[in-house]
């Protein structure tokens, strides 16, 4: 159903047909800017979506247009509490666990992304739960469960520009808790001879605990990775693209629980 919304939003700006052909997408985009079209770009995951606009006036147009479209075409009502216009130059917006803000850098605005406060609270709660489990049963399996959790949140949030600052703070907040709980059951220090998976994913300069022969992944050791646009070649449905898809999946999943 919401695919109709995707196509409609794109048709209002990105795929709007122009009378005269242009040699490049940039030329066509500049031509559209000289019209009265609503410039906007849809970002959607399931039923959670945002439309990015250049200014408040355009955002007002989009807000009312989308509200009417959902009401008339899809028979859906928007929530006034959840659906609002946010000036990213002045305050943050939240999307899929991330915070987004447009910060000034020289003469331009750049996206500054972090982790939603509620999500950080849940990360700390889950980390404490897993550490308590290791304390009560210091087995390799429980250590691997903790590593799987750390690797998962690192992989998801490493797209945030502030991910290193956010996780450094999380590690600082949890440091005393982890140390006091694991000191009686583990060995603390820099990994002397970590396994290949640890070397591939993390640096040996961070102190961590060794539990039943397994080094725990350090929470603070993560850095931002640029988010690239989706490539149509990343599909398993053609022979050539299927090879790329398989290799990509292998890189992602290889050694997640091995330490």
Protein language model regions, located:
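Non-catalytic terminal/accessory segments
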Residues: 1-259
